[in-house]
Amino acid sequence: MPLNKLIQDGDNQDLTDERFKATFDTDALAAVFHGGEDALKRIRELRDEVTKRWHLFDALPGAHRTRAERMEDVSRKLKNLMESVGEFADFTNNLDMLVIIRDVMGIEGFPLALHNLMFVPTIQNQADDEQTEWWLMDALQGKIIGTYAQTELGHGTNLGAIETTATYDKLTEEFIIHTPTTTATKWWPGGLGTSCTHVVLVANLIIDTKNYGLHPFFVPIRDRNSYSVMSGVRVGDIGTKMGVNCVDNGFLAFDNYRIPRRNMLMKHSKVSKEGLYTAPSHPKVGYTTMLYMRSEMIYHQAYYLAMAMAISIRYSAVRRQGEIKPGTQEVQILDYQTQQYRIFPGLARCFAFNTAAATVRQMTENCIKQLSHGNSDVLADLHALSCGLKAVVTHQASQSIDQARQACGGHGYSDASYLPTLYTCSVGACTYEGENMVMLLQLSKYLMKAAAKAEKGEEMAPLVAYLVKPDITETNDKFAKMLSHFEHIARHRVMHAYRQMIEEEKQGIERDYAFANHSVDWTKAARAHTKLFIARGFVKSVQEVSDEAVHDVLTTLAELYLSYELIEMSADLTANGYLSESDVQQIRHQIYDSMRKTRRNAVSIVDSFDICDRELRSVLGRRDGHVYENLYKWAQMSPLNERNLPHVEKYLKPMTSKL
């Protein structure tokens, strides 16, 4: 029996030939990628159940529908799904719902997108027991639809400048929610435009004229039966965006709108009837929603990248173009080294990012549990790490997806490829939930403190212990040597930025300005620190794989990932004579050697992502490889192929008939 389980009669012959070359069992690698055999089995069970329900599918590709039509499509599917999901899935299980939503809704959003990602987790992590009893089950069952309203028109990343107020009225035991200026209008929350009945609102808590800072409030904005907007609320859609247009991002403002005292989420902070304020055990316990969101973002980015790699590598095996030697047969474009250099590093990043996502997910869950018991010891480390991962992963994933799009030539530019959609969904994450440069600078503040400890010889946290670790000069362990190079680069960048900053301080420049004057160096240090974390995690995960054939494939991908990232930072390797140009050239050759080894298994590796055609939504990435005939069919579905089009009848025909 073939090792690749996707081989079927009648498929494109080039793709079939590629699959017969597999040196490993695709099911075994799929289990590694998806977190175990049980998880993989469950994914396939859910997919089979969805397949039985025709009313969850679309008649036309989304690209051939208007935005209003697409909003109607996803809302119809959501209603149908919520009515039937209990028959085959656990709607309280995050994995079940994630798998089903990816399959049914796609990645461009739907009315419950932010509801699932932020609204429900905030209730779970910041509401007290009584509040959880009031609201959680309704939220899980879709009886109320919510979003998370924090960002304002005038301020996003700078939370301290958020203007919305929630002033406590002791006489009525209510909070008065108010939007004092235009720039205080909540802006961007997904689902706010037309879908949400409620929001978790982040506003300044004010008691007796004293501002206690930002706190979350459970706020109804529309009647859930009539969907009429509540008096004192102004809400609407902000219009089309670069991507993710099945999410109705919106605006929200309040005119002295009143809510009950108990609508402030009170698991960590409390306000009594008399207006007495009880502070949380740690000032940043409210970060749990943000930490959860970032951990999920990293996972989604890895998955978007996996989809792009499946599309581009399958298509590169089907597409024949040009000749390596004139007069010979046209070759598969996957055989060109330039094509491999474009997309194989992205393939390696899929596994590196997927591992990082699993790690930070577990760390986030542990942190939230500890916070619930009043222990905030790991919060600072996790916050810093999540900032770095969010910035590096979103940037590199979107970068690799765009390379995959370009590698597919003109057809990659077509919506039929789904690559433009993957890119716009991925690149949006570079700015939402914290603009990437700001995220790197937040991590830099953490690294600045670590560097100060390193200079003083103090004990270091495990994440930054490399700052006082000597370089490994001799080792036969290839991974150990390459990780030592990552440590050297991160250490060099962090300590360089720190020492430059200290030199300015000695000249009388204040710390904040000295830091700002070297912020570019600090962002480079933050990137290197984050890449070290990802590299370590990837190597560790590969070493834990027991299946020998899968281990060999992942070892090659890890070598490709490490060598590619090192060459991206090669100037740091030769600085101060750490490595010679010859040493760096050896690392560069490792990239080419790893690409050559990966070539044979490339199609089978992306098959192991186990993404079905319905979910992939790509003509170029079809499992059967029948690209060209289906591109033609896809084009026939365009509404512009209808007769008597208004723009022709009203303007073009009268114009040409007179000439």
Swiss-Prot record:
Query: Binding of ATP: at which residues?
Result: 395, 403, 524-527
Describe how its activity is regulated: Activated by ATP. ATP binding leads to a conformational change that promotes FAD cofactor binding and enzyme activity. ATP binding likely occurs during acox-1.5 folding and/or dimer formation.
Q: Which UniProt keywords apply?
A: ATP-binding, FAD, Fatty acid metabolism, Flavoprotein, Lipid metabolism, Nucleotide-binding, Oxidoreductase, Peroxisome
Active-site residues annotated for this sequence:
433
Q: In which pathway does it act?
A: Lipid metabolism; peroxisomal fatty acid beta-oxidation
GO terms for MF: acyl-CoA oxidase activity; ATP binding; FAD binding; fatty acid binding; flavin adenine dinucleotide binding
Keyword Oxidoreductase in annotation: yes
Q: Motif (Microbody targeting signal) spans which residues?
A: 657-659
One GO BP: ascaroside biosynthetic process
- Residues binding substrate are 284-287, 294, 432-433
Q: EC number(s) of the enzyme? A: 1.3.3.-
Q: Which GO terms describe its cellular component?
A: peroxisome
Q: Which residues bind FAD?
A: 148-151, 156-157, 190, 319, 339-342, 410, 435
Quote the subcellular location field of this record. Answer: Peroxisome
Give the function comment from the record. Involved in the first step of peroxisomal beta-oxidation by catalyzing the desaturation of fatty acid-derived side chains.
Its subunit composition reads: Homodimer.
Q: Which family does it belong to?
A: Belongs to the acyl-CoA oxidase family.
| Matches recorded under PANTHER family | ACYL-COENZYME A OXIDASE ACOX-1.5-RELATED (PTHR10909:SF304), ELECTRON TRANSPORT OXIDOREDUCTASE (PTHR10909)
Query: What is the name attached to this protein's record?
Result: Probable acyl-coenzyme A oxidase acox-1.5
